[in-house]
Amino acid sequence: IREAVSAFKGVKRRFEYKLVTERFTYVDDYAHHPEELKALINGARDMFRGKKCTVIFQPHLYSRTRDFVKGFAESLNLADEVILLPIYPAREEPIPGVESKMISDLMKKSNRVMENKASVLQWIDEHEPELLITAGAGDIDQLTEKITNTLRNK
């Protein structure tokens, strides 16, 4: 048992460390509900006190975004800076008027809505995110390797 526990690398996409250096800490997580985001951000802030926390969040499902928009805004306000990607639809058709900007409009913290993933990579290349978190249940995980490489090459 001891050998198995020591070899356990954790659960993929649950507070998964993608890069840890003196300058950057990058974590990826599957969080896609306001309570999960709240726990994720609070946990990261506790572990990395004093580091500026930037969250890149991709909402998952139009209906969930509509139903929990206030909760998402409240949870994301716990970060210092937030970048919102477009909603990942999964199995749903778009709901008129439901978009990531709904969350952004309710937030008090510095935030921006990016139209695509390439914009996120450009932003990371131009900034110095001390504690970076990507979160969401959509296809945001397809960005993790590119983000890691962008940070590693700074």
Report residues per predicted region.
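Nucleotide phosphate-binding/pyrophosphate-handling subdomain across enzymes
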Residues: 1-81
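Short glycine-rich anion-binding loops that position phosphate/pyrophosphate groups of nucleotides
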Residues: 32, 59-61, 88-90, 137-140
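Secondary-structure boundary motif
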Residues: 46-50, 78, 109, 126, ...
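Short hydrophobic segments within beta-strands
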Residues: 56, 85, 134-135
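Short glycine-/acidic-enriched loop or helix-start segments at secondary-structure transitions
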Residues: 66, 93-94, 142-146
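A short, gly/pro- and small-residue-rich
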Residues: 100-107, 146-154
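A glycine-rich beta-strand to alpha-helix segment
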Residues: 118-150
